[in-house]
Amino acid sequence: LQLQQLQEQNESNRTMLECWTVLSSLVPLTRRIKLGAILVNLFRNPAIVAKMASTLDNISNGRLEFGLSAGWYQKEAEAYGAPFPSGSARVEMLKESVMILRKMLYSDNNNVNNKSNISFKGKYYNISNAECNPKAVQKPHNPRMALHFTPR
């Protein structure tokens, strides 16, 4: 087994555990497999996702891979109280999220205390002096991020 990957979207009635919690529980039980998550961008603030990704990448010694989906399953978004804007707006939200994630996970803007504080002002997301320290273990641009755009 090379990669254990979990997703958030569930359009069936099967049991599906929350992916970040499950992946965290696998860290001490495994040593080599990559740990992957496919996240719905609508469900979490990208600054929080960056902090979660950095944490999991650090405690797993660089084994995290994750993907982001613009979101396509309206019923699920509504069930969790998440917004479900038009397809083009979801894609724009995803683009802003990727900009924030890249800045927070990989930037080298270190201040006097060797910490990176990131600010971003966009149409959908605004963060001010958000910290993501320590940075992701993997270099140069990992954990790997895959994007998922949908036609809906």
Give each language-model segment a name.
Residues 1-152:
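Active-site-adjacent structural elements that line small-molecule/cofactor binding pockets in enzymes
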